[in-house]
């Protein structure tokens, strides 16, 4: 339902959206009726001022002149310069053809290993020989005396053990026999301690 307010306007007939010339013509008719209603002497209140401004404002002023100057500067930057001016002082780089470029086979190039001086690591045998023969190794950095250490060092054959495969039964009998002998020795010592010693008077 449409409510029509009595503001001195005739009820308008609503139809579909108007496009083209008809839409412009209806807008002009509405503006003419609005101007005519403003000019009527019997109407109360002051006339409504026409508002202009925004994007479509064509008023001239100081801000408009500065806008034009900035637009001119931007336009000159965006305009393409002529080819004659740009070619005067600059050389155009030439892209070489693929046939002119010699292919380098990177697979055949091997990087050289880094050259770092590495001290040779001595074996135990070398260390033993040097330690026993040279008295210079008996002090370390001139401050630490190694003579006591060299006196108690054992030779390598005495320290090195052979790799022997263990048999469970044999290992069990060896360990059990050693435990029994230790137990027997401990038992005998206790008995000796518990025996009353003859009192000497």
UniProtKB/Swiss-Prot annotation:
Residues 68-78 have a biased composition (Basic and acidic residues). Residues 84-100 have a biased composition (Acidic residues). Keywords: Cell projection, Cilium biogenesis/degradation, Cytoplasm, Cytoskeleton. The keyword Cytoplasm applies. Pfam families: IFT43 (PF15305). GO terms for cellular component: cilium; cytoplasm; cytoskeleton; intraciliary transport particle A. It is found in: Cytoplasm, Cytoskeleton; Cell projection, Cilium. Component of the IFT complex A (IFT-A) complex. This is Intraflagellar transport protein 43 homolog. It comes from Xenopus tropicalis. The gene is ift43.
């Amino acid at each position: 339902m449409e409510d029509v307010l009595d503001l001195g306007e005739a009820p308008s007939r609503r139809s579909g959206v108007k496009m083209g010339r008809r839409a412009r013509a209806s807008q002009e008719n509405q503006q003419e009726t609005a101007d005519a209603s403003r000019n009527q002497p019997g109407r109360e209140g002051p006339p409504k001022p026409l508002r202009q401004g925004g994007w479509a404002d064509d008023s001239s002023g100081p801000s408009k002149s500065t806008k034009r100057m900035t637009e001119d500067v931007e336009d000159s930057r965006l305009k393409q310069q002529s080819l004659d001016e740009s070619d005067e002082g600059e050389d155009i780089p030439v892209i070489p053809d693929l046939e002119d470029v010699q292919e380098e086979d990177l697979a055949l190039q091997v990087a050289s290993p880094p050259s770092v001086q590495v001290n040779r690591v001595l074996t135990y045998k070398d260390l033993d020989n040097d330690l026993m023969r040279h008295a210079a190794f008996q002090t370390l950095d001139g401050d630490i005396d190694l003579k006591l250490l060299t006196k108690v060092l054992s030779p390598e054959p005495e320290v090195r053990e052979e790799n022997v495969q263990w048999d469970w039964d044999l290992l069990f009998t060896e360990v059990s026999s050693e435990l029994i002998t230790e137990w027997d020795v401990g038992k005998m010592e206790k008995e000796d301690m518990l025996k009353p010693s003859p009192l000497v008077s």
